[in-house]
Regions:
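Acidic, metal/ion-coordinating pockets
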Residues: 1-167
């Protein structure tokens, strides 16, 4: 959608008319030559381990459009992904750098692990756009946010933290 608007477009999905507008924009992006269309979806309840019905319906709607991938955020904890043919929908990658002891983090149940997040790696092959098989590989890295003695939050790959503990 960036190619159409050359900026950020915000949508509110609380009515059918907005869904129609989003669909028109996605179709227009394809018509203007977009090779890949990724959407960032800000939806879902904070610290919910599972997406709510509204968010699931929204994801289903988006994956039935010409979008290639939906990356969700807002719940502040990791949620699952869904696949539909060559498309991927990520409900929530977590809270990349939460600040423990902040008001919203205090509301989180300990079993949602808000200090952990996922960095999602997507490998594309632009030579396979015509066959719609350009999404070659998906991998991820688990990261953890840690507040240092200097009160600065730093994000570390979990594997690196495990290696540091061995030393």
């Amino acid at each position: 959608l960036f190619r159409i608007f050359h900026g950020i477009t915000l949508y509110t999905f609380h009515s059918i008319s907005y869904k129609k507008k989003v669909l028109q924009d996605i179709v227009r992006s394809k018509e203007k030559g977009a090779d890949f269309i990724f959407m960032c979806m800000h939806a879902g309840g904070q610290y919910n381990l599972l997406p709510d019905r509204y968010t699931c319906n929204l994801m289903r709607f988006l994956l039935n459009t010409p979008l290639d991938m939906v990356i969700g955020h807002h719940p502040h904890c990791i949620q699952h992904i869904v696949k539909k043919k060559n498309k991927v929908g990520v409900f929530s990658l977590g809270d990349f750098c939460p600040y423990p002891k902040c008001a919203s983090a205090e509301l989180a149940s300990p079993d949602v692990f808000p200090e952990y997040s996922i960095v999602f790696h997507v490998y594309l092959d632009e030579n396979k756009v015509a066959t719609n098989s350009f999404l070659q590989k998906k991998t991820f890295t688990i990261v953890k946010s840690i507040i240092g003695k200097d009160k600065i939050a730093r994000v570390y790959p979990l594997y690196r933290l495990i290696e540091l503990e061995k030393d």
